[in-house]
């Protein structure tokens, strides 16, 4: 549990993108569309996440006593990544409604050779990360495409709110990750959580 009363996973991967929304819109220029890129893989996500209350952000995804297990850690990681997909889609809907020129994209960089990837896997299979996963430079290709590809700026409507599963490859995420009601719930629940600690203004 973090100092502000929520799990570190929820704070770092769910709440942080919500806090950046104001920074994002404050630097917009009609001549410089701004892209919000959310790096997201949801392979381990639970299908029970509704994000209706702040407690849903802190769900340990495990029975009491098993919170530190590799399976529970993988589920929490996947849930936070699914939240990024939901957040990116909800941000796009809101920016479109407000007439703000942002292209919000979520993506799955694939299995990348990092310590973080190894940490969410059971101990016995962690060597597979270093043997078979992509090098970080290769794993960054999807993120670089989302952030810099000219075709995204030229064909905005095609890419808005999209989910990339490789450079230039649009894919539908899981049914829950594309559920607009769950995305709406996540937005409001996260907003309430960050307002409660005084990070967002009350206006």
Curated annotation (Swiss-Prot):
Keywords: NADP, Oxidoreductase. Pathway: Secondary metabolite biosynthesis; terpenoid biosynthesis. It is an enzyme of class 1 (oxidoreductase). GO terms for biological process: terpenoid biosynthetic process. Diterpenoid pyrones display various biological activities and FDDP C shows anti-cancer and anti-HIV activities. FDDP C also shows inhibitory activity of 42-mer-amyloid beta aggregation that is involved in the pathogenesis of Alzheimer's disease. Transmembrane segments: none annotated. One of its GO terms (molecular function) is oxidoreductase activity. This is Short chain dehydrogenase/reductase dpmpH. It comes from Macrophomina phaseolina (strain MS6) (Charcoal rot fungus). The gene is dpmpH.
